[in-house]
Amino acid sequence: MNVIVDPKKLIKGATGDWEVVIGLEIHAQVTSNAKLFSGAATAFGGAPNEHVSLVDAAMPGMLPVINAECVAQAIRTGLGLKAQINLKSTFDRKNYFYPDLPQGYQISQYKQPIVGEGVVIVDIGDGESIEVGIERLHLEQDAGKSLHDQHPTMSFVDLNRSGVALMEIVSKPDMRSADEAKAYVTKLRTILRYLGTCDGDMEKGNLRADVNVSVRHPGEPFGTRCEIKNVNSIRFIGQAIDYEARRQIGILEDGGTIDQETRLYDPNKGETRSMRSKEEAHDYRYFPDPDLLPLEFTAGYVEELKAKLPELPDEKRARFIADFGLTPYDAGVLVSERESADFYEAVLAKLADGTRDGKQAANWVINELFGRLNKEGVAIDASPVSADQLAAIVDLIGEGTISGKIGKDLFEIVWTKGGDPKALVESLGLKQVTDLGAIEKMVDDIVAANPDKVAQARAKPQLIGWFVGQVMKLSGGKVNPQAVNDLLKSKLGI
């Protein structure tokens, strides 16, 4: 069988090239004030067992009642993933014993999930993208948390998370490198944040990944996969995949076989280790939950939710490229977080009609603002420079009141001290020199003082940039560099 495989994604081995095959199961905590089947709060950081109802604690006689908002959030997510929405789905009991699972089973969806197949378009750099298929999305309860470090001889259980709604988003095994897997999780998290269905906070455990990894020679059937459980950072996902792929290749090249098992990733050692043999579905003895009726809703309800969806990153990126002439890269940077895209659009909305330049605004948001935010470790919603202030700076440059260099100085002043950019230009005397006579005198002075450079510039016209720089320096950045450039060309006969 002839199979075309990108050689950059292959791993060199003693017995030839190997291809890694990756599928991900993402557990995303649903953004909701209450849990999936109870009215207990979902707030993070409460005292142990503060947010626990009788349902969450599995007290006898307590019956689950579905949270309609969690259902709506799952449908919104399915729509955002361009997936099939199933108008009828059912809940099942997944039976296993663990101390932080008080019911002795987890309420999940097995045979009939709420969302079927979908797709995510993932940018992987250099203008390339891949399609990652979505197998399904289903709703389920989260478990509690066992605490083993509170007492030398006892373990404790915190049920605050017990019963919190999760969306398990199962991908198809369509990824072929750690970088692709990381890009997929990043894109999926962005979509969830745009939709407002999950905050994607991996540090709080609100987004976790089970990573399925297998290896094969290109063109061969899929190998035996191992599942790496509960990886809680995008960086660790990449590290776990790289280690696990090489571990499996080493075993196979030594003549061994891969055991289908569940493994854990240890970020301190940078390795995976065996946790238990991988269970099959029959090990969990799934059966329909007798306490919950099938979940049914109408196509009209789905359309109602669809009509209220926000513009998603792919559509927003395409609009930025088409309407504002942005490069695909710049548009991608701006839409990578909803807050970033909103800030950019707020800047555009404040620009004067005559100077509305989408590219110029994007350059200032990406290079100056994002660069400074990253350097200082400040979130965009806490930016010292507001969208109104940045728009004013871009306007001042666009209308020729200040130069680009002075614009950067003005940005620094606003960042550190605040203030109205237009008022600061007046009070600090930052206006651009527009008197052609004054500009011509500066040009003449620089030309007269550097006859050797004049000869060089006539031989190599690109050296005119040196003269422009000297005039800018002499003026304190207050002249228009294009006007200086044109004047120099005339003076030097270039």
Swiss-Prot record:
<protein>
    <recommendedName>
        <fullName>Aspartyl/glutamyl-tRNA(Asn/Gln) amidotransferase subunit B</fullName>
        <ecNumber>6.3.5.-</ecNumber>
    </recommendedName>
</protein>
<dbReference type="InterPro" id="IPR017958">
    <property type="entry name" value="Gln-tRNA_amidoTrfase_suB_CS"/>
</dbReference>
<comment type="similarity">
    <text>Belongs to the GatB/GatE family. GatB subfamily.</text>
</comment>
<comment type="function">
    <text>Allows the formation of correctly charged Asn-tRNA(Asn) or Gln-tRNA(Gln) through the transamidation of misacylated Asp-tRNA(Asn) or Glu-tRNA(Gln) in organisms which lack either or both of asparaginyl-tRNA or glutaminyl-tRNA synthetases. The reaction takes place in the presence of glutamine and ATP through an activated phospho-Asp-tRNA(Asn) or phospho-Glu-tRNA(Gln).</text>
</comment>
<dbReference type="InterPro" id="IPR004413">
    <property type="entry name" value="GatB"/>
</dbReference>
<dbReference type="InterPro" id="IPR006075">
    <property type="entry name" value="Asn/Gln-tRNA_Trfase_suB/E_cat"/>
</dbReference>
<keyword id="KW-0547">Nucleotide-binding</keyword>
<dbReference type="InterPro" id="IPR042114">
    <property type="entry name" value="GatB_C_1"/>
</dbReference>
<dbReference type="InterPro" id="IPR023168">
    <property type="entry name" value="GatB_Yqey_C_2"/>
</dbReference>
<dbReference type="Pfam" id="PF02637">
    <property type="entry name" value="GatB_Yqey"/>
</dbReference>
<keyword id="KW-0436">Ligase</keyword>
<dbReference type="GO" id="GO:0005524">
    <property type="term" value="F:ATP binding"/>
</dbReference>
<dbReference type="Pfam" id="PF02934">
    <property type="entry name" value="GatB_N"/>
</dbReference>
<keyword id="KW-0067">ATP-binding</keyword>
<dbReference type="InterPro" id="IPR014746">
    <property type="entry name" value="Gln_synth/guanido_kin_cat_dom"/>
</dbReference>
<dbReference type="GO" id="GO:0006412">
    <property type="term" value="P:translation"/>
</dbReference>
<dbReference type="GO" id="GO:0050567">
    <property type="term" value="F:glutaminyl-tRNA synthase (glutamine-hydrolyzing) activity"/>
</dbReference>
<comment type="subunit">
    <text>Heterotrimer of A, B and C subunits.</text>
</comment>
<keyword id="KW-0648">Protein biosynthesis</keyword>
<dbReference type="InterPro" id="IPR018027">
    <property type="entry name" value="Asn/Gln_amidotransferase"/>
</dbReference>
<dbReference type="InterPro" id="IPR003789">
    <property type="entry name" value="Asn/Gln_tRNA_amidoTrase-B-like"/>
</dbReference>
<dbReference type="GO" id="GO:0070681">
    <property type="term" value="P:glutaminyl-tRNAGln biosynthesis via transamidation"/>
</dbReference>
<dbReference type="GO" id="GO:0050566">
    <property type="term" value="F:asparaginyl-tRNA synthase (glutamine-hydrolyzing) activity"/>
</dbReference>
<dbReference type="InterPro" id="IPR017959">
    <property type="entry name" value="Asn/Gln-tRNA_amidoTrfase_suB/E"/>
</dbReference>
